Amino acid sequence: MAARLLLRSLRVLSARSATLPPPSARCSHSGAEARLETPSAKKLTDIGIRRIFSSEHDIFRESVRKFFQEEVIPYHEEWEKAGEVSRELWEKAGKQGLLGINIAEKHGGIGGDLLSTAVTWEEQAYSNCTGPGFSLHSDIVMPYIANYGTKEQIEQFIPQMTAGKCIGAIAMTEPGAGSDLQGVRTNAKRSGSDWILNGSKVFITNGWLSDLVIVVAVTNREARSPAHGISLFLVENGMKGFIKGKKLHKMGMKAQDTAELFFEDVRLPASALLGEENKGFYYLMQELPQERLLIADLAISACEFMFEETRNYVRQRKAFGKTVAHIQTVQHKLAELKTNICVTRAFVDSCLQLHETKRLDSASASMAKYWASELQNTVAYQCVQLHGGWGYMWEYPIAKAYVDARVQPIYGGTNEIMKELIARQIVSDS
């Protein structure tokens, strides 16, 4: 019953958004109940703040927060040791309506709006539990199928992915090709009407548990540029020649399964091609801004979590006969952190609004990802410092947040690549 009510509220929200004025108008205080922005909120993680959200989003946020408190946080330490979350969690998330939120209902998704999706990103960050790969599955993998897949592909995979019964991954990165997607060596060659796939991928999130992987492969080495010869393929777990390597032992995100994948003469039917042949690079460029916005929102939400965790600590910890929070240097550091967090939150929220109306460009998404992920690492460093020796202990949440933050400037395109993309727009004549 709870899940059905949740789905209904999301559908109502989606229907309302079609008749509402544009986001810029909805953000004005005139004629609407004023909502606090993060600088004025009692806590940066409070429910009911930020003008981009509505009361329906607040109701949804409460249910998502409860889900993470009851179904994720109590088991996360166990999953960190296992190097993966349970498949049961995925199906629970599906029943709760937390997967495929922004995928159209006609395709088998929930049919909610982008801001509802953002709620799930933020609440996972507030839980300090990086294990569940829900956002990659729902908001990176599923859109490729929904946007470029055939009717048969959509009907076969989207409903199962929304239910958490089919876990998705995307395989771009290779041992010799990370941010340089044009350096991909994994290839697919025609064999009659089929394709023969060979190659390897590394650092694949959800790779170990995955039931379906979108694989980036070269299909035309004679193309005028590598970008013109890349295609996407849907590879299912269990296909002959598809081998999952070991789970990789990472510095952080220890409960998030990350694997190597190998493809040895995997025979794929023609129906495994996703979209048009040799158009894969363009599909990737089209979808990457959402991935970078996702990383930015996760990053600033993690900053908000770390700030509140640290504020609570320094208000309780005593030194020199008073709480650490009453030491002026600590107060100044907290003031700096909160100011930077609130400024970045305002920018990320503006990017969420732009993306909700399909107006977020690559450079803006790159700015958000670059700035927010750098700030996340700065905040993590300073918050550990404010915890003193206890911040170095794994039992303290800030220690885990510190190591989890380090990958944010690396994946989704390194921050050095983000600067290249931003600079390209600056100097472009068009």
Swiss-Prot record:
Compartments reported by the entry: Mitochondrion matrix
Residues holding FAD: 170-179, 203-205, 317, 328, 385-389, 414-416
TM annotation in the entry: none
Disulfide bonds listed in the record: none
Active site: 291 (proton acceptor)
Pathway given in the UniProt record: Lipid metabolism; mitochondrial fatty acid beta-oxidation
Family affiliation: Belongs to the acyl-CoA dehydrogenase family.
GO biological process: carnitine catabolic process; carnitine metabolic process, CoA-linked; fatty acid beta-oxidation using acyl-CoA dehydrogenase; fatty acid catabolic process; lipid catabolic process; long-chain fatty acid catabolic process; negative regulation of fatty acid biosynthetic process; negative regulation of fatty acid oxidation
One annotated GO molecular function: protein homodimerization activity
Highest taxon of the lineage: Eukaryota
Entry keyword set: Acetylation, FAD, Fatty acid metabolism, Flavoprotein, Lipid metabolism, Mitochondrion, Oxidoreductase, Phosphoprotein, Transit peptide
Activity regulation, short description: Inhibited by crotonyl-CoA, 2-octenoyl-CoA and 2-hexadecenoyl-CoA.
Binding site for substrate: 179, 227-228, 282, 289-292, 412-413
Record note on modification: Acetylation at Lys-318 and Lys-322 in proximity of the cofactor-binding sites strongly reduces catalytic activity. These sites are deacetylated by SIRT3.
Keyword Oxidoreductase assigned: yes
PROSITE patterns: ACYL_COA_DH_1, ACYL_COA_DH_2
pH dependence: Optimum pH is 8.0.
Name of the featured protein: Long-chain specific acyl-CoA dehydrogenase, mitochondrial
Functional description taken from the UniProt entry: Long-chain specific acyl-CoA dehydrogenase is one of the acyl-CoA dehydrogenases that catalyze the first step of mitochondrial fatty acid beta-oxidation, an aerobic process breaking down fatty acids into acetyl-CoA and allowing the production of energy from fats.
